[in-house]
């Protein structure tokens, strides 16, 4: 790789460069828009689902031919928890494949300089060695509860690689660890563990309960990254010099980069931390009759380390920030 990989290029993200962020209302997409605006980018393209149905090829074609963005961030996806993935696998694989295919294909056909595709750590095998390296992709069976979604995301990675090979494009995939932050989903039936814990402890505190029940033994280890750090990493990559960015696309096998903290925490430690930040004074009860899930999920972030980027927001500060946002959102209800 070239020596200047750690030097962001301001001209790559000049104020007037036209950047299309697909999925700007989601947790990650909204954070990327905030980060780009903070960097001084003032020519951002966003569209709601009502304005642009990304599953409709004709609409996507018309949009790209009319607007002709220079950079595309593909953060749009159909997402959901274990229940939704198990009940509607056909929708998850179809809608994600269509969104990715339409955007990647028409990006190439309209001469897009750079595209950043956001995947998910669920692309890695269920029993992957820890920490999970990018090279472990397709080295074993997937987690069956969300394999339709994972296969769609893997197809997106392979589509970017194929277009790079055939059309000499510069389409790069990034795989985030578990994300959290302002704008997260706090629905207890659909949310992930961290926002669910925030809500549980808050509601227990407000109602004067003496205990909060947490599923499992508390021993599984998980990695968490604040969504603003994820956005900063994406913008950092998009701002790399043209030669450095192209070097990544050409040399990385597979052509993807993990983005995470590089360290994990047990669910028990996480629960204790959330309890402290929320101010709940009762006990934590671990329901050991409930499943634990995978013992550990930690990303290897060596590739991002080599590029000179590291996450800045500590888990404690990030949870406090997220809880503050949650309190404001609750007050609006």
Predicted regions and their residues:
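NAD(P)H cofactor-binding loop motif with strongest signal on the N-terminal glycine-rich segment
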Residues: 24
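Adenosine-cofactor binding site in Rossmann-like domains, unifying the SAM/SAH pocket
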Residues: 37-62
């Amino acid at each position: 790789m070239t020596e200047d990989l750690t030097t962001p290029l301001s001209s790559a993200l000049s104020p007037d460069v036209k950047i299309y962020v697909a999925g700007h209302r989601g947790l990650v997409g909204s954070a990327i828009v905030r980060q780009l605006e903070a960097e001084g980018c003032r020519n951002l393209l966003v569209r709601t689902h009502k304005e642009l149905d990304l599953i409709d090829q004709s609409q996507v074609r018309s949009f790209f031919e009319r607007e002709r963005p220079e950079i595309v961030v593909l953060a749009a996806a159909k997402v959901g928890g274990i229940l939704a993935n198990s009940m509607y696998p056909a929708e998850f694989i179809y809608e994600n494949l269509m969104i990715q295919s339409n955007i990647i294909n028409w990006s190439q056909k309209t001469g897009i300089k750079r595209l950043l595709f956001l995947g998910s750590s669920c692309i890695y095998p269920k029993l992957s060695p820890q920490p999970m390296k990018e090279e472990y992709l397709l080295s074993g069976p997937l987690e069956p509860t969300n394999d339709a979604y994972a296969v769609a995301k893997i197809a997106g990675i392979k589509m970017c690689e194929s277009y790079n090979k055939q059309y000499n494009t510069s389409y790069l995939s990034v795989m985030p660890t578990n994300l959290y932050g302002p704008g997260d989903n706090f629905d207890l039936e659909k949310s992930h563990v961290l926002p669910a814990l925030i809500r549980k402890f808050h509601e227990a505190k407000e109602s004067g309960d003496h205990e909060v029940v947490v599923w499992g033994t508390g021993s599984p280890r998980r990695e968490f990254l604040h969504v603003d750090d994820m956005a900063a990493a994406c913008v950092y990559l998009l701002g790399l010099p043209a030669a450095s960015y192209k070097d990544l696309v050409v040399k990385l096998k597979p052509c993807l980069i993990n983005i995470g903290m590089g360290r994990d925490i047990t669910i028990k430690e996480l629960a204790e931390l959330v309890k402290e930040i929320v101010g709940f004074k009762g006990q934590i009860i671990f329901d050991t009759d409930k499943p634990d899930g995978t013992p550990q999920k930690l990303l290897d972030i060596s590739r991002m380390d080599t590029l000179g980027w590291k996450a800045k927001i500590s888990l404690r500060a990030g949870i406090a920030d997220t809880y503050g946002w949650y309190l404001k959102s609750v007050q609006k209800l």
